């Protein structure tokens, strides 16, 4: 008796490389942005040197475009070209030239109405919220899909799961505990 398990390959799903950096991490509680439905979200900063992940994302966007042609067409007579609709893969050098975290990188904003699974490098669930912050590195399981909402058309990125691989310098101006302690220690000696 054979145990034939066929893995279904979803061309619109991508698992990023381990050098993807997480920013604007909002993965513990859903938040509403501009009055919309509350969502979990993260900005994934992908080095341009990670050509494997970048190519997978481009292929998934293309697959989502073809899968969603009817949705993108809507009531119109034609499907708009992929080059003229909203694209989730964005160039950090062009869109965030003053932010060193985005230099030589692409970025994708991923979100979901359901909480992502979050695990460590050994695939154990992360339960301590402070372990996941803007600046950590890890893999992200994401999927791409077409949308057409009130004439606003494009490809969006859904957030499935996250795997933290390693810590990184916190982004967003939050000081590390080490630097805060050192500063306090120095200030105490200055006033003594």
Predicted regions and their residues:
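Short acidic, low-complexity segments enriched in Ser/Thr/Gly/Pro
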Residues: 97-126
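Residue-level recognition of well-ordered beta-strand positions that form the cores
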Residues: 43-45, 109-111, 141-143, 163
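OB-fold/S1-family single-stranded nucleic acid-binding modules
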Residues: 151-167
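Short acidic, Gly/Pro-enriched loop/turn segments at secondary-structure junctions
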Residues: 168-178
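OB-fold ssDNA-binding interfaces and closely related basic DNA-contact patches used
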Residues: 1-107
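Exposed beta-sheet edge/beta-hairpin loop segments within beta-rich domains
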Residues: 122-138, 145-155
């Amino acid at each position: 008796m054979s145990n034939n398990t066929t893995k279904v390959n979803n061309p619109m799903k991508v698992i990023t490389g381990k050098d993807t950096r997480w920013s604007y991490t909002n993965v513990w509680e859903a938040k509403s942005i501009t009055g919309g439905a509350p969502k979990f979200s993260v900005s994934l900063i992908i080095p341009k040197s990670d050509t494997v992940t970048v190519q997978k994302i481009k292929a998934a966007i293309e697959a989502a475009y073809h899968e969603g042609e009817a949705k993108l067409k809507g009531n119109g007579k034609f499907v708009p070209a992929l080059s003229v609709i909203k694209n989730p893969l964005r160039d950090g050098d062009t869109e965030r030239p003053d932010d060193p975290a985005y230099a030589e990188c692409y970025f994708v904003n991923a979100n979901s109405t359901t909480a992502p699974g979050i695990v460590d490098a050994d695939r154990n669930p992360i339960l301590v919220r402070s372990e996941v912050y803007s600046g950590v590195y890890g893999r992200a399981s994401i999927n791409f899909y077409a949308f057409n909402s009130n004439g606003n058309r494009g490809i969006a990125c859904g957030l499935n799961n996250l795997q933290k691989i390693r810590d990184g310098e916190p982004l967003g101006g939050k000081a590390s505990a080490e630097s805060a302690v050192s500063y306090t220690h120095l200030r105490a000696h200055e006033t003594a």
